[in-house]
């Protein structure tokens, strides 16, 4: 089994490694870190005005390509898509997610015990899980192939072809 996580799901992947050690073949971390501290303003806003908080995150999360006028998908708005997806969640989901990220404290120990091959794909312009934090994270993992893409936090939508190519290459080495 290969577990892949993006952002907060990287913290979940760290914990799954503890639980499923014997079943795992590899771990893939996309725009992740071993810790994801959250600004108090955003934590408060996620309770008071979750829609505004999610709109801010969608804007921060995208790199320069997030704007419809300059992204690689003509006519596509990453901001619009992101906001539509966030509106599908329960109003309390973002608050709980942000608090879970902020409260998670076992990332260093969890990263150090990874024994399976790992892949980390980080983003140069990530404002949600900054590159500096991601690079410190991968240093904790003994066997971690690392790539950095020139985009923001939402690599799967900002650089889908590049991300898929990197993941496919990594997975092909496992066979």
Region roles according to the model:
Residues 24-25, 141-144:
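Core-facing hydrophobic residues within beta-strands of well-ordered domains
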Residues 38-113:
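Conserved alpha/beta-hydrolase catalytic His-Asp/Glu region
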Residues 114, 120-122, 126:
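Short beta-strand/loop motif that positions the catalytic acidic residue
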Residues 116, 130-139:
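Short alpha-helix in the alpha/beta-hydrolase fold that links the catalytic acid
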Residues 144-175:
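Catalytic active-site module of serine/aspartate enzymes centered on a nucleophile-bearing elbow/loop
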